[in-house]
Amino acid sequence: MSAAIYLVKGREKSVVRRHPWIFSRGIDRVEGNPQLGETVDVYGHDGKWLAKAAYSPESQIRARVWSFEKQDVNRAFFVKRIQDAQLLREDVIERDGLTGYRLIAAESDGMPGVTIDRYQNFFVCQLLSAGAEHQKQNIVDALIEVFPDCNVYERSDVSVRKKEGLQETTGVLHGEMPPKSVVIEENGVKISVDIVGGHKTGFYLDQRDSRQQAMKYVKDKEVLNCFSYTGGFGLYALKGGAKRVINADVSQPALDTAKFNAELNEFDISKKRAVFLNADVFKLLREYRDQGTKFDVVIMDPPKFAESKAQLNGACRGYKDINMLAMQILKPGGTLLTYSCSGLMDQVLFQKIIADAAVDAGRSVKFVERFEQAADHPTDTAYPEGFYLKGFACKVL
């Protein structure tokens, strides 16, 4: 008989509504001696069976639901999950000509704590929960069954694993070591990805739709691409006919890759058309403001400022500061494309921050378009936390 957890009376509601998280305060008792990541049965206070979940004794999220059906959590289970996820994405893969996409979006694909990104034939896994770690071999075996020629690499070098009682880890799980550059394609744009050393799993796949939508704002414009990383938005700006694009980032290796990506797409990278500037964006924005340098379009896609609720207030100040500075260096009628990937900051709060930035900048600002994560990053209706990326196109008058 498997181990089991019984919920506090009244705590069943979220599970009945199929939310996949069960917090420690919602558990009345544990029967058996479940180990880190082990699958347990979940029961209501009345003894009614509710779900199969992975047990995590060191996390505030004490259990994460694998299934709301009575089924074994084994290789066959993950094969079905992966097949369903691939089928869900077939339309967008064909529509956008993708050779890089998110295959598994954790809880939203019924695999809590599991992220799998595909770059050509390299599948990059981030296993962020005790249950994901416990099921690692089943997940890898399932990938091999669905994609027989795949290579699987792990990028679980994420600090959140510590909350689950896990160490950070990386390495080959199956097949070959990824090369320094794996070239993917999206919307006809070629992008070199460093799976082993790049941010996240190598690239920001979630911004693909926003990159495409940005093109309509840049034709014949002077564009400043802040926190450019390997040039994603800058590439689309060049494709969209921008007069000039300045890509600014603090990482020289990222800028070198951005330049390589521009060359890969055969874009004009003369200094009249494309600049790759190693700079602290906060300092750079202030320098441009003080010098009176103006742009037609500013793209503001910073890294996550808030990893926890304790950091949220500081993150709000950071977002307001950079957006205020961006508004101050825009020409009248210019466009600010601004984004936040902090899940703790919802769209309403982000919109308020932009409004506060407009007041501090002394500019009249209009929201003209809203953005969210790309279609291969779905959000399950029972798991609103899966919606994390939000953005706005703003006209700055």
Swiss-Prot record:
Task: Please give an example of a GO cellular component term from this record.
Answer: cytoplasm
One Pfam family linked to the record:
Methyltrans_SAM
**What is the predominant subcellular site recorded for this chain?**
cytoplasm
Keyword rRNA processing belongs to the record: yes
Q: Which reaction is recorded as catalysed by this protein?
A: cytidine(1962) in 23S rRNA + S-adenosyl-L-methionine = 5-methylcytidine(1962) in 23S rRNA + S-adenosyl-L-homocysteine + H(+)
Tell me where in this chain the PUA domain is found.
2-80
State the compartments where it is located. Cytoplasm
For this UniProt record, the keywords arranged alphabetically read as follows: Cytoplasm, Methyltransferase, RNA-binding, rRNA processing, S-adenosyl-L-methionine, Transferase
Write the Enzyme Commission number(s) for this entry: 2.1.1.191
Q: What InterPro entries does its record include?
A: PUA (IPR002478), PUA-like_sf (IPR015947), PUA_sf (IPR036974), RLMI (IPR023542), RlmI-like_PUA (IPR041532), SAM-dep_methyl-trfase (IPR019614), SAM-dependent_MTases_sf (IPR029063)
Q: Which GO terms describe its molecular function?
A: RNA binding; rRNA (cytosine) methyltransferase activity
Q: What does this protein do?
A: Specifically methylates the cytosine at position 1962 (m5C1962) of 23S rRNA.
Family per similarity comment: Belongs to the methyltransferase superfamily. RlmI family.
**PANTHER family for the chain:** RIBOSOMAL RNA LARGE SUBUNIT METHYLTRANSFERASE, S-ADENOSYLMETHIONINE-DEPENDENT METHYLTRANSFERASE DOMAIN-CONTAINING PROTEIN
Name used for this protein in its record: Ribosomal RNA large subunit methyltransferase I
Q: Supply the source organism for this entry.
A: Vibrio vulnificus (strain YJ016)
